[in-house]
Each structure stands twice: as structure tokens, then as C-alpha cells.
């Protein structure tokens, strides 16, 4: 499910500003900070916060409350939320909470190429493209249906894709430029305050 223009320019600049402060205040590979996934692909965990330039620790919802509300409202109101469980009544479905908010950066040679990649343990995932499509080559976001059909999603800056987390999804290899995205995962456990795996 694609939501066109979910984030506007102001929202996106707030995300970039916060991610840059978190990155600047956290050494590479420090637990809970930012990590290199593969050559050409790194991510920063934003949900639990980071040390700002004034040396105060602040979380993403504290710094970007309007953006966080917009993201969560879109996910909770998505019809995919109801299809995450095989139950007929929304009242019987468990509440969803934030598992992680991640800022992803892909440069030439980077991608997420895994024919079986799913978000294990998560219920609903959103990926928002932060970069304008003309700023990179390749790097299309794809989802794979149960019958094996692959859909390439051509996204503009601020567009979001929402999908059931157990759906196979990938990012094709970036051939040039820089592709940035914001990923939000919701799960049925309590809100996560550390890295993605706790």
C-alpha cells in the first residue's frame, strides 16, 4: 500500500536534522547507535534517542512529535493493520507499539538483496523514501507476493509504503548517488527503548 506525499518537505528536513545529530553524537557501531549493515548501507536507530549537540539525550518522538504522530496515524489507520491477524474483530487484535524507527542510507553498491527478507517478530512496517528519485540510480523498493510476483515501487520524496512485516521486501542495489529512507516497525510487545532486537 503506497501513501503518496505522507511526509512534506518540513517533515523530511526535521528527520534529517535529528538523524544527523544522533549520528554525530554516537561513535560507529556503538550499541544502540548507528551500524554499517553492508558496504554501501548503514542505518541509525532513532526510536530510543541520541545525544544532541547540547549534550542532552532526546528521543525521536520528543524532537519530531508531529512527524511521529503522522507516521503512527497512517500505520494504525491502514487497512493492512486488520489483515495482520486472522481475526474478524479489531477489538480482539493486540495493540501495536513501536519496535524501531530507523534511518537508512544507501550509497553506490548498497542495497538489501535477500530473496527471503522479512521483518521477523514485527507486525506492520512502513518505509518512507526521503531522497528525491533523481538523486540516486537503482535502489527501487520491492515487495514480493506469495506467488513470487515482484512489485517495484517507484516512490517520490515523502512517499511511504506500508506492508505486513512478514511480506518479503528488498531494496535493489543503488548504482549511484545516495538513497535515504525512514523505516518504522510496529509489534505487539511493549514499546521498545533499546535497539531493534530487545
Identify the role of each PLM range.
Residues 80-198:
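Catalytic core of non-heme Fe(II) oxygenases with the double-stranded beta-helix
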